[in-house]
Regions:
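Active-site regions of oxyanion-processing enzymes, predominantly non-cytosolic
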Residues: 148-152, 191-196, 269-290
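Active-site His/acidic residue clusters
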Residues: 156-166, 248-251, 277-311
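Extended, H/D-rich, highly charged conserved domains that either
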Residues: 165-166, 173-242
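Metal-dependent active-site segment of extracytoplasmic phospho-/sulfohydrolases and closely related
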Residues: 9, 13-18, 301, 305-342, ...
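Short, small-residue-biased leader/transition segments that mark boundaries at the very start
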Residues: 1-7
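Substrate-binding rim/cap in mid-to-C-terminal beta-strand-loop elements of soluble/periplasmic
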Residues: 342-383
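Active-site nucleophile/metal-coordination loop of metallo-enzymes that catalyze phosphate/sulfate
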Residues: 15-166, 170, 199, 207, ...
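Glycine-rich tight-turn/loop motif centered on a GG-T
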Residues: 168-169, 211-220, 252-263, 295-303
Length: 391
């Protein structure tokens, strides 16, 4: 098996979808394929590192050759959970199958009934109620809030209800109380959102509004123990890089490293590989593929971001020691050529690399992302309670 040797440091980076999910029709995502369509739009991608690892074997990707002797094990994974959001995908990687999905309101905004209930319980009206970036929503409604004291509420492609409030107009404790009220309302299965976020800001007018550090998240914690908890309880390091600590609400995390971009995330991962003698898992979420390019339906930008990632991946691989294991995978698709702005239900790649590997090949596709958590726990001889078997 790929994990027959013992690896001291395991590094998991998450990236992008490769189409063909068996249940794509249930999500109205038939025909989506993030990487294939980006390759077509960009007239081929130049990703020599991923190509040498064998990524081209996972589909028909213009510019990424199918090579006979890949340097890694490569395979396709299907998601078994209900949902195609960030939390669901990451939780499944670490062993949890979500049956009742988190609900997203990307294309519709929250229903009137939800908003009315929130307005009644908080005593203020709402404006916004669309999927929007944090800066744009403030430029659109900030001045209105200065005049009226109405809540600014908005969402994104993930399962979130965000409430923006100017710190001089609405006191922080009132904002936090409103978030608790929203969290309570959003426990209803019809409106079940993964997280409610307080988004306080300051500033005097359009173009001058800035968010403050007083953000607060009211997230649903994983509903059972994950592989991260199992590792932590057995005294292994679990380093969460990027959004990982938020996604797991800090559960099972022993060290947090914040990032501001893909490049920053990869640089910090390269630093970890170079300088941190940890024993356990480093779990990295690269934010830009999704936020900057997938949701904004910018295929060219996405392609350039994959090429940049490929350059940094080579540097990371050069820093790996003989007893390191690297996995590159994804939590969902986000086809930038598809309608709407939402994630897309797709298979995801799993590329597993170590300098110790003697034979490398394409493995059969598997039916859950949970094999990632299973394989990591198996390596460290930690009992795994989640879905999926070690490979």
């Amino acid at each position: 098996s790929a994990a027959s040797d013992v690896y001291k440091r395991q590094i998991v980076c998450d990236s992008m979808g490769i189409g063909n999910a068996k249940d794509a029709d249930k999500y109205d995502d038939l025909g989506t394929n993030t990487v294939q369509h980006i390759c077509e739009k960009c007239d081929g991608l130049n990703v020599p590192t991923l190509e040498k690892l064998g990524f081209g074997l996972l589909g028909d990707f213009k510019g990424i050759n199918k090579i006979s002797y890949p340097k890694a094990y490569v395979m396709k994974l299907n998601e078994v959970s209900n949902g195609k959001d960030t939390m669901t995908g990451h939780w499944e990687m670490m062993g949890l199958k979500t049956v009742k999905p988190f609900i997203t309101f990307t294309d519709t905004g929250f229903p009137d009934e939800f908003i009315k209930l929130f307005e009644e319980k908080t005593g203020r009206k709402c404006v916004g109620n669309i999927a929007c970036s944090g800066t744009k929503i403030l430029d659109t409604y900030g001045e209105h809030q200065l005049k009226t004291g109405d809540w600014i509420v908005y969402t994104s492609a993930d399962s979130v209800f965000q409430i923006a409030a100017h710190e001089d107009i609405i006191p922080l404790d009132e904002l936090y109380k409103a978030c608790e009220i929203a969290r309570e309302i959003a426990m209803d299965d019809r409106w079940k959102v993964g997280r409610v976020i307080a988004r306080p800001y300051i500033g005097s007018g359009e173009g001058q509004f800035t968010r403050t550090a007083n953000r607060h998240d009211y997230a649903l914690a994983p509903f059972a123990k994950t592989a991260l908890d199992d590792l932590k309880e057995n005294n292994f390091d679990v380093i969460g890089v990027g959004k990982i600590p938020d996604i797991f609400v800090d559960q099972g995390i022993t060290k947090k490293i914040r990032t501001v971009s893909n490049e920053d995330g990869m640089n910090k991962t390269i630093e970890l590989a170079k300088n941190e003698d940890f024993n356990g898992l480093a779990f990295i979420n690269l934010v830009d593929f999704d936020a900057m390019y997938g949701h904004r339906r910018n295929a060219i930008g996405y392609g350039q971001a994959i090429e940049s990632f490929d350059n940094q991946l080579k540097i990371l691989i050069d820093e790996l020691k003989d007893d390191d294991l690297l996995m590159v995978t994804a939590d969902h698709g986000n086809d930038p050529t598809y309608k709407g702005t939402d994630h897309t239900r797709e298979q995801v790649p799993l590329v597993i690399y170590s300098k110790q590997f003697k034979d490398h090949k394409q493995l059969n596709e598997e039916n859950t992302f949970g094999i990632i958590g299973a394989t990591i726990c198996d390596n460290f001889d930690v009992k795994y309670n989640g879905i999926g078997k070690s490979i």
